């Protein structure tokens, strides 16, 4: 037993060479990390040069697998909550009166504590505060009532007091029996009625709720009551189409009983995804490419062909002098295998990833390696027609290498007639004078490479993703054909391969021609697999749109730079031979394949929410320019990013492109109309609609300065004073008379400060008992309650900050309007033992700041009005009902094994 429990030490690979004919096993996420590393090596060459003159940038390669896990967690997270009772919208403060209390709207009290203090010189903090307040509204209003507490009263179902949204239990002990009976009668009248929503029985009752929260709740309830049945049908139908394309059966196990009468279901996301949302993101082409690899690319092995092919064609003699025979027995190093991975990535993402040759003096000096690469390169890659796998430089180098190989006559000499231009392959060779000019690269027609005289891009039946309707057909192979590796490829051929065999025979390379003739079935299986991977597994919202794909080659030839430039990866000469001798054979489908549509929908939904946030923030500078004097579009971009989910930011910034996004990129993205519908987007838009009134965000620009004495009433009749529930506040019920208000703009304040008369001018206005308005700037408003004298910093606080200093014989003044403003409520409490002058001071206390907000934050009400705010209709689902989020059903089911694998 001890021997069985003993853990075996892991075998550590100490050699860069590989074992056997199976070279490696690469999964989608692993290949995405590898591709990201290689792409970043190219991208950061330019970025690093640019950043040497600016700030430091973290070039750490992110963990793609962790990012995908985080996005899956976002899909599982609910943007709403299921509760038994709604939050308390109104609370009451007990005074010494037996028939008057203070009713407080808790929404404004809570909202005043959300976010940071706004200042003029920190626009990013202002934007961040606005977003926090909007998210607070959305979060508090997004709830579903389920199994609410109720009681029976005379055969009627009556809601328990805590369900009504009004907190009044602290008031009951001080009330008279008559008042308590009156409130109890009102509570007994809170009858829960039976209703019907979308064929489901529900409870309907009247409660209290603050206006912004109720807007979100009402919009959310309307979303549920709309059933989303057509959206669900569209999503399931689209998933079935996608499953047919990707050979995946859609599983309906989650939807087994969602149509039952006791089921309430919520669909938070929708399919298909709007691809414009994903591709409109600035500088996102590389990030989308990496996501396509990570979510779709299958796990596979690099399989070598039958070794007898080379042994009976290239190395059948004892003495082998040909370039192919020399390289036949070589084994790749780890670095060379990395180049093989790059080659297959370029083949699987034609046009998006293109190859160039490394500057390696050792290999450039080895003519055998170059010549072999020149031959197999023309059979591996496509250079023109509709797309390319190569740069123009690499295509020319391969032409030169093929030229050298044809002229290298190591067996027998053949006749060569040279052309007049001196270009590579400008000659005719052999007895039949085969014209080798046809193998010189022509990106306009694809001549000389795999795209020569073949239809390698096809448009046929409509694809599930509307933006990528193309089907890739390397070597003219239809990806719908079933592949049996033992027989597939026999008797198949295509134009470039035939011409290569003819040219090799004409050049006297009979053994090499025999080798390629024997390799043809293996070669066709290789590209048949690649076609299937591209057209089935890699078909995704992250696939390059057709219009961008069609523009890649013309832009490359013309040297034009567009939004989706190709990524150039460097490979060695000898890696072309190793890539030709190995085929990427899929062994397992990608683990993310069935949930990829859900990941795409979550990502697109979050992007849409970010875009809506940025649109509204971009309008604020025009609405309140004085509070955003120093604001730039980059500020609201940063604010939205800071408050967005980390997983979404990580996907957008996979290639560290955020450090290089400019204002043009941002504004173009904000103004584009594409959005991905989802529950989160619906609630976010409704929250912004509620936030259009800045007073609902506890922000105001109506702040006044007026000298007002704190009331010090005589206590001649203590009983009467207590019954009145006396209190004082610096919040105005109406704006002051306009003819008594002096408006102080920034310009007036600065002018008087420069003249050294600012304080004197304010004093003169207040001595005349007039008002001074400091408007034009939004201020953060806090609400506080006191039952004793408030601190002096609140009583005598000014609605501005004014600092003066001297430097170098000059006087400097600094004025800021955007300061924190406090609305305070002072509740007077007296005892029967107090004397008439207990509240009177020798020197009066003055308050300086007055605030006007056109909202009822606090009201003094009679006891009979405590439940007068019950005016909102709520829908609650019965306890026997089940509430189910069926968003997780928007993923495909069982991956089918590829036929004949």
From Swiss-Prot:
Location in the cell: Virion
Keywords: Virion
Organism for this UniProt entry: Bluetongue virus 1 (isolate South Africa) (BTV 1)
Function in brief: The VP3 protein is one of the five proteins (with VP1, VP4, VP6 and VP7) which form the inner capsid of the virus.
Family of this protein: Belongs to the orbivirus VP3 family.
Protein name in the entry: Core protein VP3
GO molecular function, one term: structural molecule activity
InterPro entries on file: Inner_layer_core_VP3_Orbivir (IPR002614), Inner_layer_core_VP3_Reovir (IPR016029)
CC annotations in GO: virion component
